[in-house]
From Swiss-Prot:
GO cellular component, one term: extracellular region
Keyword NAD part of the UniProt annotation: no
Signal peptide: 1-23
InterPro entries in alphabetical order: SCRL
Organism from which the protein derives: Arabidopsis thaliana
UniProt similarity note: Belongs to the DEFL family.
Upper classification of the organism: Eukaryota, Viridiplantae, Streptophyta, Embryophyta, Tracheophyta
Listed name of the protein: Putative defensin-like protein 238
Record's subcellular location: Secreted
Disulfide pattern: 30-87, 40-65, 48-78, 63-80
Annotated GO biological process: defense response to fungus; killing of cells of another organism; signal transduction
Primary subcellular site in the record, as a coarse category: secreted
Regions annotated as coiled coil: none
One Pfam family, short name: SCRL
Amino acid sequence: MRSITWFIVFCVFMFIALNHVKGQVKPTGCQGGQRYRGKCGTNGTKTCVKDMMLPKLFKTKRCDCQDMLGTFKGWHFCTCYSGRPGC
């Protein structure tokens, strides 16, 4: 009886430990990215929304702007995410 109790307790703790993993990002809908001339500037999000000319239907949840280095110095890369799942 004692071994069955320990086994059940062990299974419960393993379930909790495996389902409480931090650092995993759940997919948040559609993602689109594109390279553009120029730098991100002080407000990269507005720059990316303007550059990508996103329609209002896209409902941008977040845009990330990253200045590029190396061969593409003087360019920036925009990645925008929508809040719509299943695109």
